[in-house]
Amino acid sequence: MWVNYYNESRLELDVELTTHCNARCPQCSRTNEFNVSEKKEWLPLNQVTIDDFKKWFPKIKIKHFHFSGKYGDPGMCKDLKPIVEYIINNSKTTTISINTNGSMRNEEFWFDLCGIGKQRLELIFDVDGINQEMHSFYRRGTSLDKVLKNIEAACQTISKVSVLTVMFKHNEDYIEDIQNMCRKYGVKHFDTVEGNNFLYGPTYKFIDEDGKEQKLEQITRKDREQGLERKDRRVRDHRHDTEYKKIVCAALKLRNLQVSSTGLVIPCCHLSTLEKTIWYKKGKHDEYITTHGNGNINPLIQEYIDRYYDFSLYHKNIDEIVNDEWYSKSIKNSWSSKDTASFACKKVCGIC
């Protein structure tokens, strides 16, 4: 379990440094699909400070930190540079990766950040089109020109710079063109991922900034489809079976845990919806934290919610959290039966 990885200094953490974001991506967990100009009502706006980070990690015993965001972009975190510097200065081998839309700050900021992280830092910029119209149909509120300038600045350093493209029908024929465009700015590493919030069908409707209904469409080219697995992360949508034979936890396989911007240590991003139940007491809870996709909250998840102080880095250290019976035993035991596993565990990590 995770405690073994921590004791061996092999644990990796995905840390959400902020819930602030400059973009309005329709399928993002923070975005109100009925008005993309707004965030979800329940989501608090906060960010991790350098003092928070030092308190959470007085000793750096983590193999890799990944700064991304289910609810925010790490580029919006005011203390991003001092946090990266703290990790570099207080560890010998710990590596860092940062996933960002890149349409904030200026070239000097990203150049300086790479100067701090050097070979131990990877920046992953999101580029979703060959022009502003294509790029911003999904990556709304961002400037492709600004992203490319920031990419070019980062590529002048010894840090690794990558580009990630989220694939939809509107850009699936332009993936090679997007990558060739980015090569001109110095990028050598590329990755793609399907837009994967297509649970009920191949279209995703949302209301744009002008109050008009728009729709994202799922990729149609079979040679682009990535199927059930992508780098050991399971992707579920309407195309895939719902029955499974066993649960193989992708987060455990990757030696990974999530840390929210409020300091909660959570097994994976799919279970991060339990934060809504903790911080926002009204409204319907997410199906992922139930047992069968509806009804009451899964008992194991309810225990986490009731005891959330025990999983908060403001109250416990990471060593105590991964040694807690909930992490060391209970969650694994829950995977043995459809009647005890959470809906998220079955839906996302159930092998057909």
PLM regions: where:
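Short, basic and Ser/Thr-rich N-terminal targeting/leader segments
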Residues: L11, A251-K253, F343
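Conserved alpha-helical substructure of the radical SAM core
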Residues: M1-E122, E133, F137, G141, ...
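Short cysteine clusters
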Residues: C21, C25-C28, C249, C268-C269, ...
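Hydrophobic side chains within well-formed alpha-helices
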Residues: F109-W110, I318, A341, C345
